[in-house]
Amino acid sequence: VPALIKLFRDSSKIVRETAGTALICIGQPSVNPLVEALKDKDFVVRCHAARALGGMTTDYQIGRTWVRDANVVDALIATLKDPDRAVREDATIALGMIGDSRAIDALLEAMKDGVVKRHAIASLGMIGDPRALPAVLDALKGKGIKQEGTPTPGCIVSEDAFIKEAAATALGQFRDPSVIPDLIMLLKDGVLREKAAQALTVIGDTAIEPLIAFLYDPKASEVEAEGERVLSYASVRLTAKDALRLIVLETLETLGWSPPAEEVQISSSKADNLRVDRPLGDTGRFGPSGDVAKSS
């Protein structure tokens, strides 16, 4: 074990990660040496110690089965105050991978640290303790997020979208039906709708009826003019309204709901036009002005 921990100082990332995987496979005998490594002077060693304790290697979550020692959780909680941001990030994620609810209060406090906020939210979702639900829901609604400048439609210009993505994913992991309305409304957001849809499918069957109600309520499923303008930039995209309808139908189908035949025909024909993976040259147009692309 000591020899493997020494490899955390190796210049090769592959060597360092392989050493971490080996320590995880060794199991319980690695715990105390790794906890001690969290205090090492070298921040790289501290990072890899945190990752190993959380099972954060190419074999994600294999650490969950054996790292349940209270000393591990306490040591990682203390590491949330590390002066190096990378170490704090790794410790935050490790606590989520371990999945011990004793870390809830510390992770809620870590949400105040802008550097690790989205990781703290993700970890709270992995743990799934309902005590954290209100704070994660607040993050989804943008509370406590600092943003400078005016966002450009359709573009990510701050940490805001990343935090909301983490919050949407985490809300699904709580599997609490009370968040379904918030996730459904998030489907209107062109950037975040995929995460919201995934979260709804994780919550399960209880999301079906609210989604159907949303689908057939013209007022509820209205798209703001700005959103329509953003999604109409590229001629190969659906209108914002059609894109919203399509994601709702796809989510319902994933949940096992069979739409009426006419809806299937509509969604299929619309989907054929939503080819965002096509090279720009295939359509000849790009950008808000629809300028013609010319071959070089």
Question: Where are the regions that the model predicts?
Answer:
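Alpha-solenoid HEAT/Armadillo-like helical repeat scaffolds in large eukaryotic proteins
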Residues: A3-S11, P33-K41, A75-P83, A106-G114, ...
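N-terminal compositionally biased or targeting/leader segments
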Residues: D74, D105, P181, D277-R278, ...
